A protein has these predicted regions:
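Charged, terminal alpha-helix-loop-beta segments
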Residues: 1-309
Length: 309
């Protein structure tokens, strides 16, 4: 079934990015997704790069008919930091969802990344360096609402946290934390909001006036990083450096060094793409092999202050 015919059969998805190709083999119940070499080297928020988000939106629509999803992509000539992050995302998708796999033509690239980088060790996260800006922030922007949510009693409905803060850096480096050793894009790469509740870690991807499917890809990526920090210990912090107290990072560090039982990832939004339904979120949680990772949604009403819904 070609792309046009297949899209006509979907609910809540009128079109896909032009640089994402799909084909559905009805007889074998396999959905094929194709991504071009430009998209794998761009920010994962962009529609054409957010393969995870589109896969879930499509699969949840047709889960009775699809048994396998195969992702293929054109390998870029220059493998930049975005591409290395893309390989990590593919690897983690395959680890968490048994019906997903890269195409045969792309397996070698994934295995090389896994053997030479992911399981080779010496992967480090960066620390926060400076306090975030607090003055002259425009009202009704994501930065504004991010600060409005810095309240342990007003971050998730009917939930009180021990501590919460924002802008947790998630730059990944090999061997050493500096510009020359960056593995993924690191500049402004950060989890919008985080919180600790007993032995639970909560992370939040905040959006305002932004209904892109890429929010799924972003949240999953941050969940995978936290999983590799807290559960698998494939990523760690450089203990040779002093643990800063900026934005309560010392409290975060202390909590994740203990036994975190569950990691929650929350879509904190005023609105969502129509394909991102509660049924889709349930589907992600049901299909995910690691039941210690749970995705949730929290909507809010954006005014000068925020109100959870």
């Amino acid at each position: 079934m070609d792309k046009k015919t297949f899209l006509q059969s979907l609910r809540n998805i009128q079109r896909l990015p032009s640089k994402i190709d799909i084909n559905f083999d009805e007889s074998r119940k396999i959905l094929y997704i194709g991504v071009d070499s430009l998209s794998v080297c761009k920010n994962m928020q962009e529609d054409a790069s957010a393969f995870e988000g589109w896969i879930f939106c499509i699969y949840a629509n047709r889960k009775r008919e699809i048994e396998r999803v195969i992702l293929s992509w054109d390998i870029p000539q220059i493998k930049n930091l975005h591409y290395k992050r893309f390989l990590y995302r593919v690897l983690k998708m395959q680890e968490h969802f048994l019906w997903f796999a890269p195409s045969e033509n792309n397996v070698a690239d994934i295995m090389d990344f896994k053997d030479s980088v992911y399981t080779a060790g010496n992967l480090f996260l960066n620390y926060p360096q400076n306090d975030s800006k607090t003055e002259n922030i425009k009202e009704k922007t994501e930065a504004y609402f991010e600060r409005a949510f810095l309240d342990p009693e007003n971050l998730f409905l009917n939930t009180s946290f021990d501590v919460c803060n924002h802008q947790l850096p998630v730059g990944i480096f090999r061997d050493k934390v500096d510009k020359e050793h960056g593995l993924f894009p690191y500049g402004k790469s950060a989890i919008d909001l985080w919180a600790i509740k007993a032995d639970e870690l909560w992370i939040f991807e905040l959006k305002y006036n932004n209904k892109k499917v890429g929010i799924i890809s972003e949240l999953l990526f941050y969940l995978w990083i936290m999983e590799d920090l807290c559960f698998h210990h494939r990523i760690r912090y450089d203990l040779q450096k002093e643990i800063p107290s900026i934005r309560d990072f010392d409290k975060f560090y202390s909590a994740v060094q203990k036994n975190i039982s569950t990691i929650y990832g929350v879509l904190l939004v005023d609105d969502l793409h129509p394909a991102i339904t509660s049924e889709l979120i349930d589907f992600i949680n049901q299909e995910n092999c690691n039941k210690q990772i749970i995705v949730k949604t929290q909507k809010y009403k954006p005014h000068i202050t925020v109100k959870l819904l």
